[in-house]
């Protein structure tokens, strides 16, 4: 598994295009990976997750993948300095039960809501599957509760802080939009990002390693799901 750190040039017209359209950003990220002649999406096949973090001078683009990327296809002047790519295998060996880490995660916390009967009928007539509607969680408490539930599924818990509350802080991040094409039909994309900073304790190393590799939550193609770990803070 590999992690790329890209220092983007915020004056680049190509980056500004990507920043304005989340699907274009996805395409730029995926340009570093081989095309897949299969039914499995290339992002899923290569285990690609990415996150755009604000920095003092603009943005840092982090990209995690199962295979080593080739960033030579990036447009000229997209970066202000050479990319940094490191092998994460040594870090994965530190993932053991009971270990505590500081972490950052940008996610798209939602809850599934059953569609109204009229809406389900309309979807059926259009040949679409009867899927629930996903509603964005907007209050800090509901966002924290969502991550606690994710921890139960993915082998970690959020410890209690000094104030008696979960040691985590959700911050509303930017809402991103874009447009993809399904056949001849354009499809509008809207992703509400929430950034989580805090601490976690691993309870099941196998489940947590899978979560590290594959990400958690929805919106993984669009900047969500990547978990970054660091030594715990005092």
Describe the function of each predicted region.
Residues 1-234:
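RNA-interacting cores
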């Amino acid at each position: 598994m590999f992690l790329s750190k890209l220092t983007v040039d915020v004056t680049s017209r190509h980056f500004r295009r990507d920043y304005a359209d989340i699907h274009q950003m996805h395409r730029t990220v995926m340009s570093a990976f081989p095309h897949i002649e299969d039914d499995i999406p290339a992002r899923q096949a290569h285990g690609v997750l990415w996150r755009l973090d604000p920095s003092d001078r603009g943005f840092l683009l982090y990209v995690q993948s199962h295979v080593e990327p080739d960033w030579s296809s990036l447009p000229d002047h997209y970066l202000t300095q050479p990319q940094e790519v490191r092998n994460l295998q040594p870090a994965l060996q530190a993932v053991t039960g009971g270990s505590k880490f500081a972490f950052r995660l940008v996610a798209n916390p939602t809850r599934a809501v059953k569609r109204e009967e009229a809406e389900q009928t309309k979807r059926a007539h259009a040949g679409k599957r009867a899927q629930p509607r996903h509603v964005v969680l907007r209050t800090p408490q509901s966002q924290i509760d969502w991550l606690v539930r994710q921890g139960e599924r993915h082998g970690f818990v959020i410890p209690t802080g000094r104030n008696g509350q979960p040691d985590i802080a959700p911050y509303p991040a930017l809402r991103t939009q874009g447009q993809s094409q399904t056949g001849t039909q354009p499809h509008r994309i809207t992703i509400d990002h929430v950034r989580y900073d805090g601490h976690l304790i691993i309870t099941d190393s196998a489940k947590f390693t899978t979560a590290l590799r594959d990400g958690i939550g929805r919106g993984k193609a669009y900047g969500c799901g990547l978990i970054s770990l660091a030594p715990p803070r005092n």
